[in-house]
Each structure stands twice: as structure tokens, then as C-alpha cells.
């Protein structure tokens, strides 16, 4: 087994590989700007014409889910806290099933572009506006951080130019989003998934070779207590246990996969409901693959540095720099491969940022422009959508610049992103699962859930949980020697959810701090969702419930839930009060029923009457 040595630096070939990834991403945008007649309507631009198929959408969902925060953060998480993080494999399964069987059927049969349009259909315009504004604010904030945080971590270890990377990422994303719309975003994501897999593979293969085999890595991990898969402690104050990951993780990530515009917009762009559901289940395989790669990289990190921790030895200044440090350590003799891993990390960033920009443009056009300017033509809306992509791209780059001045507030912003998702998911669940819920209950429930989530989340940042709650594992520096001594790094970044933003020391710990504020961060969304649901139900009941007849399209019906089990020989899409059977529920995307009905070539019913 090789011993750690002085780390290398970026060379010309590394920059060439990284630049190549950006150029190919931009080229895909140019292609889809003109392919098939270009972006003639807002539906073409925002939804890919609603004719996408399962496999590219599945890969896009995977890429959008796995940002650079995952590529850099998950291995360091495993390095510090152990492989219990791999329990998220079960969480992903539950998330995909809930999203595919509860939320997707309702969104798909309505043929909507913005998920927040559902809130007006189900409740009223005020509820829709609240949901839209919350989404826009959290997404701009989070996207700016996704651009800045990995650039900072990579800059500090590799010397990769910080602002060059930030601006290049933002400009390239804005470029191909503006030109090619959702089709460009999805197919660029497909390319970037390949880059992510190649980057992980290069690190894993070389780590296995240098450490003397997979068995050596696993033995080192076992000896260091990193194979801690099964911690069934039910205490909700423990940061990561089987239950916090399964329960809290399911709520947290369902708020993204189930109701977040960035993800929903992709799978409802599929040409049939079957394809939409299939994209989610294929995506599950991708999630498992990326999780396996990132967890194994974390174990390889520990095997490599089990007796000389670079973080404790001040070789790096924060945990999120450990993966770039490992890459320059083990791949320095292979010009271009460090650049491939940086391209891997930035592929995660590009996919997340492009998804966010496209989603922001969609909700702005659908929720804030179309309802008030109904005379605009589809061509005009397409141009406006492209213009909004440019505006939001610039805002996200500006947010990245602001993030550089925020210092430790980066973690607070990431936490707020999670805290907003829970109440929003509770709001959608209230509408889809509770037929008697009314608009008053929805508004009051959303405000209550949001307030409670902010309370516990901000409190946890000001008064962080004690180490016995987070359970960090032992790190050793006894094996460090004088030949393994690089210049200390001075600038710091912080690992999400592991340290305090405000660093309040020497305060008298109160029961509120040791209990409520010490709640596992994975339960923030859980609390927000459940409070929103409970308050929404109680307020709806106390105000007389919903007084108007409820269109069955707005809730999950028995036919929706059981449609995949062939219980009904004739499936129905209830798109009006006069429902009638069709050959295959979901064969035609309902957003294009007017096209089907006006076509003399279509001989079958489309499941709707206009």
C-alpha cells in the first residue's frame, strides 16, 4: 500500500478536460436551439414539447439530484461519520414510490407546467402566489450557493481559479438553458451523468490499486468503525440513525422529488404517464449508483488517511476539501484525471443550476405573467421564457458573489432550503390527500409549518447540538511525518449541517437547546410537513371545510393509485365530470389534448372533452 505524499497541482491537461466539459454542454444547447424548428412555444421551451421519453429524463433527474455538494460532501460525511449514510438507499426507494404513486398522477393528468398552478386550482390564487414566492426565493438562494461552495472548496485545494469557475458555470448554464430550453437541460444532464460516473470511477479504481485492493479499504474502514450501518437508536436528537435517515430523509427528499418544480417539471414533460413513472423508477437505479460511488469514495478516503487525517493535520481547512485533496494525491501522475474529477463535481453543479434556472423561468411565466397578461401569444411567451432564463442566470451568479461575503451563513442558507421544502410538501399533500381541506386551512397551515421549521432550524444554527448528538468518529494523525507537509490553508468553508453558523460558545445550555434545537436536521422537513398538514386539517374543519364541489382531478383517486396493477381493464383519466374510458391511461399527455382532438389522423379518444 502506497503512503500519502505531497499532493500535486493542476496542469494544462486538467484545464483542457474541464473546459471540454463546458464546451460540450454549451454545444448541446446550441443544437436544441435549432433542432426540430427551435423553441416555437413556451411549452417547447419549458416542457420540451411534452414528448420526452423515460431514459433521458431519468438520467436528468439523477443529475439534478446529485449536485457538487453531494460529490464533495458525501465522501467527507462517510469519512467523518461512517457508512450509515448508505441507508439513504432505502430512503430513495420510498421517495421514488411516493412521488410516482401519489404526486405524479395528479400533476400529470392536469397537464400543468408549474406545480404551483395546482395550488390555485385546488385552493385559490393567494395560496398559489405564496408557494411561488417561497420557491423562487429558496431556489435563487440555494442555486447561488451551489455555484459558489464547490468553487471555493476546489480553489483552496487545487488552486483552480475561484471566480473563473463561478462565472464560467453560471454563464454556460444560462447559455444552454436560454437557447435550448428543457430539452437542452435534459440532454446536457445525460452527458453530465456520464462525466460524474467517469470521475468517480477514476478515483475508485486508483484508490483500490494504491491501497492494495477492496479488502484493504473495507478492513481499514471496519477497524476505524466506519462500517456502522445499523444504528437503530430511536432518539430523534441523534444526527444520523436508521430512523432519522429513513423517516426524516424520506420527508426531506420527497419535498424535492414530489413537489419541487425543478424535478416535477422533468417527469411531467414525458409523453405518457407510463413514461413519467418509468423515468422515476429508472432514476432510482441512478441514485443508488451515485450513492454507492460516493460512499465507497468516503471509505477510500478513510483507508488512505486513517492514520494521518489531513483535516486535523491542517492540510485542508474544511471537510468538503477532502475529496479534491485525495484526487490530487492519488491522481497526480495522470494528467487530465484530476481535471476529470473537477468536471465530475461541476457536472453536478451544472445540472442543478440549469434545472433551477429552467424551473424559475417556468414558474415566473406560468404563475406571474400568464395569469395577468392573457393576450400574449405562445411565441411571445417563448421569448419571455428565454429572457427570464437570462435574468435568473444573472441573479444566481450575483447570489454566488453575495455568498462569498456571507462566510458561515452558507450553512444557514442550505438549512433554510430544507426548511422551506417541508411546509410546501405539507401544503401539496393537504390538497391531494385531504378532500375537505379549504384555502383558509391551507394558508394557516403553511404559515404555521413555515414558522415552526424556521424556529427549530435557526435555533439549531445558533445553538448547535453537542458532539454526543452528532457522533463524529475518531480521526488520527499519528502516522503523519515530515515529508507529508504541505502549506496550511487559511480560508475556510463549512460542511452543511455539521457546525454552527453563529458559533455561540460558553452559554448555559437550557432544555430547549438540548432538546428542541438538537433535533436531527433531517427532521426539519418532517416537522414542517406534519405541522402544515395538522394545522391545515384542524383549521379547515373549524371553518366548515370546503363548501364547493371538488373536481376529482385535484385529488388522488382510487383509479390513480391502482392504475399500475391492472385491476381495472379500462383505465380512466378523470379530466372532467363526464369521464369516459380510454385505451391506456396516460397514453396522451393531457396538455396536448387540443392538438389530438383537432387531428383527423387520431382515431382514438383522448380522455377529455373540451
From Swiss-Prot:
Catalytic function, reaction form: (S)-lactate(out) + 2 Na(+)(out) = (S)-lactate(in) + 2 Na(+)(in); propanoate(out) + 2 Na(+)(out) = propanoate(in) + 2 Na(+)(in); pyruvate(out) + 2 Na(+)(out) = pyruvate(in) + 2 Na(+)(in); acetate(out) + 2 Na(+)(out) = acetate(in) + 2 Na(+)(in)
Ion transport in keyword set: yes
Tissue: Expressed in normal thyroid, localized at the apical pole of thyroid cells facing the colloid lumen, but expression profoundly decreased in thyroid carcinomas. Expressed in normal colon but absent in colon aberrant crypt foci and colon cancers. Present in normal kidney cortex, brain, prostate, gastric mucosa and breast tissue but was significantly down-regulated in primary gliomas, gastric cancer, prostate tumors and breast tumors.
Start-end of Polar residues biased regions: 596-610
Entry superkingdom: Eukaryota
Motif interval(s): PDZ-binding: 608-610
Gene Ontology biological process terms from the UniProt entry: acetate transport; apoptotic process; chloride transport; iodide transport; lactate transport; monoatomic ion transport; nicotinate transport; nitrate transmembrane transport
Region of interest (Disordered), ranges: 585-610
Residue stretches spanning the membrane: 10-30, 52-72, 84-104, 133-153, 162-182, 190-210, 240-260, 280-300, 337-359, 390-410, 416-436, 440-460, 519-539
Extracellular topology ranges: 1-9, 73-83, 154-161, 211-239, 301-336, 411-415, 461-518
Pfam families in the record: SSF (PF00474)
Glycosylation sites: 485
Cell compartment(s), UniProt: Apical cell membrane
Entry-linked InterPro entries: Na/Glc_symporter_sf (IPR038377), Na/solute_symporter (IPR001734), SLC5sbd_SMCT1 (IPR041992), Sodium:Solute_Symporter_SSF (IPR051163)
Swiss-Prot/TrEMBL induction comment: Down-regulated in some primary cancers; due to aberrant methylation in primary colon cancers, astrocytomas and oligodendrogliomas as well as in cancers of the colon, prostate and gastric regions, and glial cell lines. Expression reactivated on treatment with a demethylating drug, 5-azacytidine.
Role summary: Acts as an electrogenic sodium (Na(+)) and chloride (Cl-)-dependent sodium-coupled solute transporter, including transport of monocarboxylates (short-chain fatty acids including L-lactate, D-lactate, pyruvate, acetate, propionate, valerate and butyrate), mocarboxylate drugs (nicotinate, benzoate, salicylate and 5-aminosalicylate) and ketone bodies (beta-D-hydroxybutyrate, acetoacetate and alpha-ketoisocaproate), with a Na(+):substrate stoichiometry of between 4:1 and 2:1. Catalyzes passive carrier mediated diffusion of iodide.
Record text on subunit structure and interactions: Interacts (via PDZ-binding motif) with PDZK1 (via PDZ domains 1 and 3); interaction increases nicotinate transport activity of SLC5A8.
Family designation: Belongs to the sodium:solute symporter (SSF) (TC 2.A.21) family.
Protein name as catalogued: Sodium-coupled monocarboxylate transporter 1
Amino acid at each position: 500500500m502506497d503512503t500519502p505524499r505531497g499532493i500535486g497541482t493542476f496542469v494544462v491537461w486538467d484545464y483542457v478536460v474541464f473546459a471540454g466539459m463546458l464546451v460540450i454542454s454549451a454545444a448541446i444547447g446550441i443544437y436544441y436551439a435549432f433542432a426540430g424548428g427551435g423553441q416555437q412555444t413556451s411549452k417547447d421551451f419549458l416542457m420540451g414539447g411534452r414528448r420526452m421519453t423515460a431514459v433521458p429524463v431519468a438520467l436528468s433527474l439523477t443529475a439534478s439530484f446529485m449536485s457538487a455538494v453531494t460529490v464533495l460532501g458525501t465522501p467527507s460525511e462517510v469519512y467523518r461519520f461512517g457508512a450509515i449514510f448508505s441507508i439513504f438507499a432505502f430512503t430513495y426507494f420510498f421517495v421514488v414510490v411516493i412521488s410516482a404513486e401519489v404526486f405524479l398522477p395528479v400533476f400529470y393528468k392536469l397537464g400543468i407546467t408549474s406545480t404551483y398552478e395546482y395550488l390555485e386550482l385546488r385552493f385559490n390564487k393567494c395560496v398559489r402566489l405564496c408557494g411561488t414566492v417561497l420557491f423562487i426565493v429558496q431556489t435563487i438562494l440555494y442555486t447561488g450557493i451551489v455555484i459558489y461552495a464547490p468553487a471555493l472548496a476546489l480553489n483552496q485545494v487545487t488552486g483552480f481559479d475561484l471566480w473563473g469557475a463561478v462565472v464560467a458555470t453560471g454563464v454556460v448554464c444560462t447559455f444552454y438553458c436560454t437557447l435550448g430550453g428543457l430539452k437542452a437541460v435534459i440532454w446536457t444532464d445525460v452527458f453530465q451523468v456520464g462525466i460524474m460516473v467517469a470521475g468517480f470511477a477514476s478515483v475508485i479504481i486508483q484508490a483500490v490499486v494504491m491501497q492494495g485492493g477492496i479488502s484493504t479499504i473495507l478492513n481499514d474502514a471496519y477497524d476505524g468503525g466506519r462500517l456502522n450501518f445499523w444504528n437503530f437508536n430511536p432518539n430523534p436528537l441523534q444526527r444520523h440513525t436508521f430512523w432519522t435517515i429513513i423517516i426524516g430523509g424520506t420527508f426531506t427528499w420527497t419535498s424535492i422529488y414530489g413537489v419541487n418544480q425543478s424535478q416535477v417539471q422533468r417527469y411531467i414533460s414525458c409523453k405518457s404517464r407510463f413514461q413519467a413513472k418509468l423515468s422515476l423508477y429508472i432514476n432510482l437505479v441512478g441514485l443508488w449508483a451515485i450513492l454507492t460511488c460516493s460512499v465507497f469514495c468516503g471509505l477510500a478516503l478513510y483507508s488512505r488517511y486513517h492514520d494521518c487525517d489531513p483535516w486535523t493535520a491542517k492540510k485542508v481547512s474544511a471537510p468538503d476539501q477532502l475529496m479534491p485533496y485525495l484526487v490530487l494525491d492519488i491522481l497526480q501522475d495522470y494528467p487530465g484525471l484530476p481535471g476529470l474529477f473537477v468536471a465530475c463535481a461541476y457536472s453536478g453543479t451544472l445540472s442543478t443550476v440549469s434545472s433551477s434556472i429552467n424551473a424559475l423561468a417556468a414558474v415566473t411565466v406560468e404563475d406571474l405573467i400568464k395569469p395577468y397578461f392573457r393576450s400574449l401569444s405562445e411565441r411571445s411567451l417563448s421569448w419571455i421564457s428565454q429572457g427570464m432564463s437570462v435574468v435568473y442566470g444573472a441573479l444566481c451568479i450575483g447570489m454566488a458573489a453575495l455568498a462569498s461575503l456571507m462566510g458561515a451563513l452558507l450553512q444557514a442558507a442550505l438549512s433554510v432550503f430544507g426548511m422551506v421544502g417541508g411546509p410546501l410538501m405539507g401544503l401539496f399533500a393537504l390538497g391531494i390527500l385531504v378532500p375537505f381541506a379549504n384555502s383558509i386551512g391551507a394558508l394557516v397551515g403553511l404559515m404555521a409549518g413555515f414558522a415552526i421549521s424556521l424556529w427549530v432550524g435557526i435555533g439549531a444554527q445558533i445553538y448547535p447540538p453537542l458532539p454526543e448528538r452528532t457522533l463524529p468518529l475518531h480521526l488520527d494523525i499519528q502516522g503523519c511525518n515530515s515529508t507529508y507537509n504541505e502549506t496550511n490553508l487559511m480560508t475556510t468553508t463549512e460542511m452543511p449541517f455539521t457546525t454552527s453558523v453563529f458559533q455561540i460558545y460558553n452559554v448555559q445550555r437550557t432544555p430547549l437547546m438540548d432538546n428542541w434545537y438538537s433535533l436531527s436536521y433531517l427532521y426539519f422537513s418532517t416537522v414542517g410537513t406534519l405541522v402544515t398538514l395538522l394545522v391545515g386539517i384542524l383549521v379547515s374543519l373549524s371553518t366548515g371545510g370546503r363548501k364547493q364541489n371538488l373536481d376529482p382531478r385535484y385529488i388522488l383517486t382510487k383509479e390513480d393509485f391502482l392504475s399500475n396493477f391492472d385491476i381495472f381493464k379500462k383505465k380512466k383519466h378523470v379530466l372532467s365530470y363526464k369521464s369516459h374510458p380510454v385505451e391506456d391511461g396516460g397514453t396522451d399527455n393531457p396538455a396536448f389534448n387540443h392538438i389530438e382532438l383537432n387531428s383527423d389522423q387520431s382515431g382514438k379518444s383522448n380522455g377529455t372533452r373540451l
